[in-house]
Amino acid sequence: MNLKPLNDRVLVKRLESEEKTAGGLYIPDTAKEKPSRGEVVAVGPGKHTDDGKLIPMAVKAGDTVLFNKYAGTEVKLDGVEHLVMREDDILAVITGETGRK
């Protein structure tokens, strides 16, 4: 199934959180929080101003982003959990080695 976000909305696939802490301790599934990091899958065209001008999106498909853990609406696409959120809910784009899968 395909989903095309409208206006300034973004479709994000959550990236899995770490299984182990920096100190080497394993985190059980019951103690894990939902990750607040994800990969942008699709973006809408952007937001329109009151006079009709289009403000383009700052993120693009493939970007790794950091977002508020309460952001967005959860949707399942082909059995995989995604979030639909406004671009304003995205806190930062992660670049470099940290952002790679």
Curated annotation (Swiss-Prot):
The keyword Cytoplasm applies. Transmembrane segments: none annotated. GO terms for biological process: chaperone cofactor-dependent protein refolding. It is found in: Cytoplasm. InterPro entries: Chaperonin_GroES, Chaperonin_GroES_sf, Chaprnonin_Cpn10_CS, GroES-like_sf. GO terms for molecular function: ATP binding; metal ion binding; protein folding chaperone; protein-folding chaperone binding; unfolded protein binding. Keywords: Chaperone, Cytoplasm. It holds the Pfam family Cpn10. The keyword Cytoplasm applies. One of its GO terms (cellular component) is cytoplasm. Together with the chaperonin GroEL, plays an essential role in assisting protein folding. The GroEL-GroES system forms a nano-cage that allows encapsulation of the non-native substrate proteins and provides a physical environment optimized to promote and accelerate protein folding. GroES binds to the apical surface of the GroEL ring, thereby capping the opening of the GroEL channel. Heptamer of 7 subunits arranged in a ring. Interacts with the chaperonin GroEL. Belongs to the GroES chaperonin family. This is Co-chaperonin GroES. It comes from Lawsonia intracellularis (strain PHE/MN1-00).
